[in-house]
Amino acid sequence: ANWATTRSDASRSIDSGPPMAPELDRQPLLDDPSFRGVAFCRELSARVDAWLRRLWEAADAPTSGAALVAVGGYGRGELSPGSDLDVWLIHAPRTDVSALADRVWYPIWDSDVKLGHAVRTVKESLALASDDLDTATAVLSVRHLAGDESLSAELAEKGLALWRKRSRRWLEEMDRGIRDRHEKAGEVAFLLEPDLKNGRGGLRDVHAIDWAALAGMPLLAGDDVAVAEAYELLLSARVELHRRTGRAA
C-alpha cells in the first residue's frame, strides 16, 4: 500500500521511533564547490545511503523479511540538492511491517527531506509494474539499501524480466509520452528557462535511452561519450540551480 507523503497525513498517536535518530547533514557538501554534476549526485546519494542504513539499524529492523530500496533518481544515484527521496520498503508476504515503516519514515520527515515512499511485497510491486509505466521504470532503478538483500535482488531481477517481456508495449507508450512531454515543455531554442528534466534533450530523454537499451532496443550507435558529456552538463546545471535557489528547479 502507498503511504502518505507528509506528516500531517499520518496519525500523531504513532510512536515516532528512537528519540535520538541519526541526522543527515548535507550542508558541508552543499558548501563545497569542488563537487558538481555527476560527482555531486553520487556523493550526496552515498551520504543519504549511509544515513538511511543508520536509521534502519536504529529502527531495530529484522535481518530477513524486509528490505529498504532506493528507486527513481535516488536509485540511479542522481540526487540533487532539491530532489525527492524515493524509497520503498519491500517485505515478505504476511509480514506486518507497519510499525517498522513508521520508525523509518518519521525521522526522514523530521529531517525536512521530501519523501516519496511505498510499502509493498515483491508481488505487489510487480503487479503495479505490469500495468503502469512509471512503476515499471522505477523498478528498473531498484538499488538495495538495507535489510534482506534477497528481496531487493528478486524485485530487481523480476522487474527487468517483466520490462523485457512487455518491451513493445512500454516502448510505444514511452514514445507517446516523450512526444507529449516535448510539446508541453516547448521548443528549447526559444525558451529563456528550458526544462532540464522534461524538455527535449533533457534528463528524461537520457533515461529513455537507458530504458530502451534495457528492453533490448538500443537507440545509440557508438555515441555514448557525447551522451555522457551531455548528461554531466545537465546534472551540473541542475545541481547549481538547486544550490542557488534552495529548491528543486
What residue ranges belong to the model's regions?
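Short, polar/flexible loop-turn hinges at active-site or ligand-entry regions and domain interfaces
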Residues: H91-V97, L145-G147, K165, P218-D223
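N-terminal regions immediately upstream of nucleotidyltransferase
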Residues: I14-S64, E187
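Low-acidity, Ser/Thr- and Arg-rich intrinsically disordered low-complexity segments
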Residues: N2-S13
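Helix-loop-helix transmembrane hairpins and adjacent membrane-interface loops
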Residues: P93, A101-D102, T121, E149-E157, ...
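Active-site nucleotide-donor binding segment shared across nucleotidyl transfer reactions
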Residues: D49-S98
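Conserved nucleotidyltransferase catalytic core and NTase-mimicking acidic/glycine-rich helix/loop elements
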Residues: E23-Q27, L162-A249
